[in-house]
Structures are given as structure tokens and as C-alpha cells.
Amino acid sequence: MSMFLGLLFLFPLFFILFKNLLPPRKKLPPGPTGLPLIGNLHQLGRLLHSSLHKLSLEHGPVMLVRWGVVPMAVFSSNEAAKEVLKTHDLETCNRPKLVANGLFTHGYKDIGFTQYGEEWREMKKFVGLELFSPKKHKSFRYIREEEGDLLVKKISNYAQTQTLVDLRKSLFSYTASIIFREAFGQNFRECDYINMDKLEELVQETETNVCSLAFTDFFPRGLGWLVDRISGQHSRMNIAFSKLTTFFEDVIDELLKTKQLDDHSDLVTAMLDVINRPRKFGSLKITYDHLIAMMSDVVLAGVNAGTVTMIWTMTELTRHPRVMKKLQEEIRATLGPNKERITEEDLEKVEYLNLVIKESFRLHPPAPLLLPRETMSDIEIQGYHIPKNAHVKINTYAIGRDPKRWTNPEEFNPERFLNTSINYKGQHYELLPFGAGRRNCPGMTLGITILELGLLNILYYFDWSLPSGMTIKDIDMEEDGALNIAKKVPLQLVPTLP
């Protein structure tokens, strides 16, 4: 009996000792309670960035949600984003292998969705040299200015009769024309097989499918694979991406009729030249799959994102007449009256336009969650343990609305950027429209130039007003989209000559 009592007395001591010998339990970020198998999927709505923002207000700027059975770390403050994208950039610069991304990129042969490694580095170097280098950017300046002239000419026809302009269609055509001429060597006005409306539909369908989830992505692999086949999800993705591939094959066939491959006048001819004369670029052997994947990347990232930002900017300017008036007065006073043509030299002269664009990026980042990252090792962010192979989301939408960082964050006020060094090039983590670190957007310079030039043209040459009977309060601000979050209801305005 006494031995039993002694053991009973010693047991708590042994338990405490044993517990102290165990490694300490790592502190995971807080997050909403999930359900078995599906995790938190039932709490995530159609607009993922908005759903995650609402959850972060309850659970904090570092949050863990379950994407089915997959852990997803969500970061909603500039401090946390800096730790991820700067301090732990190398450990978080991988991309998760998602079914849609693999199909879209022909087996991860691009630079946007490909996993981090030697092939990605070599491909990024090649594309940087053949499309995004300062030399190439300068050589393509005439294309951008010509398309700016054409945009003004088209809108002038509407202005003469004061007819409504669907800015989405006008600005999509302007952006797509530049991208196709620079990257693919194709001028829409010389191509009978390219229909702008059908191209816009194709881009939208592709973007929707790139961001759609396969059950394989978040269910146990065998179960997810089976559900994808039974539900037809895998088949739907294949059909959508095959349409894009067929379109690019037509572009390539047309280009081969008219271009010399060895002049490397655009990305497609440069890649075809390397493919047709087998050799390696560094350690990378470029294939036809690389070409189609890169064309897909350029269209997805280059065409829609710029259009979306111009539309949101014009929407906010229309909703805020004070800002519109101040901006147009500055533009016209700086550039002078009766200017025949806007050039890229003019972009550096209009300081307030730069502030307006920053504010538009803050409130309406085109891709509010950026592209997903994946941790390659266990890391610690803001004192929380983030496990290896967790998906990583940077919610730039939430960061732009953080009241701890911004005064009156829901207010459109470009003056907030006066006398600050904050820019959108990836060094300031409160404003990240192009991301930061190793996986930032390589086409940032081109994207910004297209955006600034388009806005400068339509704001210098035209005054803009709402349709008769419509007021500022009637402007619908509902969002829509998958990767690039656009204005759901088209922005239609009446242009007039000043």
C-alpha cells in the first residue's frame, strides 16, 4: 500500500520531467475553426481577398486557414509581408503545384507559376533579355506611342457626337495591341484572324480557369483526383486552356509567314530561333512548350492587369471630381495647350498622376493576393511557426486598408503620398501591386508605362462625364474576377473635347 502511494506521489513528478524533455510545441498562427476534410473552404467566398480580409480582422494579420487539408498562411500587414518577401524570400519563393497552373503552363514551363530552381532562373534571364530589358523597352517606345495615338483617335469619334464609351473595351484594345506587338510581333490591324471581342472573352475564360481549384489541390490526392474526373473539373480546364493554345498556334503560324527568326524582334521570334537551332540558354533547353507557356504568361499578366487598373483609376476620378479637376489642370498646364501627341517623355512631368496611380493601386491592387507562394522549409513570421509546404498568401488588399498604416483608409486621397518615398517597385511593403523579392513581376516597367501613357492620353485630350441622369452615387463599385479583380459593371462615360 505504501509503495502504491509512493508511486502515485511520484507520477506527477515523472510527468512534468518527461514533458520538459519533449521539444516545445510550436506556436501556429491563429485562424478560424475548420471542418474535417474541407477545412475552412466553407468560410471563403467568391472574392477570396475580401473573405480573407474579413477573417483577418477577427484573427489578426498573421493567420492560418485550411485550404481543405492544405495549410495556408495569410499575411495582411506590411510588417508581416516584409518578413515574408524580404527576410524569408528565399524560403518562400517557391510556387505550389496546382492542377490548373500545371495545365496552363504546359507542365510548368513559364516563369510565373514554375517552381523555384535553375530552370526558372534561366527562363527569367532569357525573357528579361528578349522582352523586358531597358534596351528592348526603349526600342518599343514607338509602338506604345502609336497605340496611344490610336486610342485618342478612336475616342475622338465618340467625343464629336458625345456618345457613350465603354472604357473597358477601349482600354483593353489599347493594352492588348501593345502587348501583342511587343511580345508577339503581331499588329491587330493587320491580322484578320484576331477578333478583339473574342480575345477578351478568351482572356477572361483563361483567367477564371487558372484560378479555379481542382479537388486534387486541397483533398487527399486519390480522393481529389477521383472527384475531379467525376465532376468534369479536369476536363473543363483542359478544354479552356486548349483554346488558348490553339490561338497561340495561329499567332505563331502567321508570324512565321512574315518574320525572320534571327532578328529577335520580339519574344516569340527569339524563342522560335532558339528552338529551331537547338542549343541551350545556360543550362536550359527551350522547347515549344516553353514558348506557349510564356505567351500564356504575357497575355494573362500583361493585358488584363493594366486594363483593370486604368478602369479603377477612371472610376475613382469620376467619383471624386476634385481630384479629377486638379489632375487635368496639372496635366494641361504642364504639357501646354494644343499638344499634338503625348510622348513617354511627358510621363515624368506629371507628378500628381503618379500620386493618383499609387492611390489607385492601394485601394484596387489588380491581383490583390499576388500569386501564391509555398514555403520550402519551416519558418517563423511575427513569432508564429509556418510549416514547410504551406501555401502563402500576401493580401495586398487588406494591407492597403489597414487603419494602423493609413489614415481614413477607405477614402480615395492621392495627397496621402505627398512628401513620402513610398513607391510600387517592391521596396515598400505597404504598396505591392507587382509583388517583391525574387518572384516580383518582371514586366513591371512595361506595365507602368502602358498604364501611365494610356491615362495621360485620355485625361489630356478629353473631359469625362457620366451619362445623362446618372450621378456619382449611382456608380456601382462591385468587384468581379479571379486573379485580376475588375469592376463588375462596365464603366461607361461620355467624352467631350475640352
From Swiss-Prot:
EC number from the UniProt entry: 1.14.-.-
Required cofactor names: heme
Any one GO MF annotation of this record: oxidoreductase activity, acting on paired donors, with incorporation or reduction of molecular oxygen
Database matches in InterPro entries: Cyt_P450 (IPR001128), Cyt_P450_CS (IPR017972), Cyt_P450_E_grp-I (IPR002401), Cyt_P450_sf (IPR036396), Cytochrome_P450_71 (IPR050193)
Residues the entry annotates as binding heme: 441
UniProt keyword Membrane, yes or no: yes
Gene3D superfamilies, A to Z: Cytochrome P450
Keyword terms: Heme, Iron, Membrane, Metal-binding, Monooxygenase, Oxidoreductase, Transmembrane, Transmembrane helix
Principal location: membrane
Ranges that cross the membrane: 3-23
Entry's Gene Ontology cellular component terms: endoplasmic reticulum; membrane
UniProt KW Transcription keyword: no
Membrane protein topology class: Single-pass membrane protein
Subcellular location(s) of the protein: Membrane
Superkingdom per UniProt: Eukaryota
Classification via SUPFAM superfamilies: Cytochrome P450
The family this protein is said to belong to: Belongs to the cytochrome P450 family.
Name recorded for this polypeptide: Cytochrome P450 71B31
Organism encoding this protein: Arabidopsis thaliana
Recorded name of the encoding gene: CYP71B31
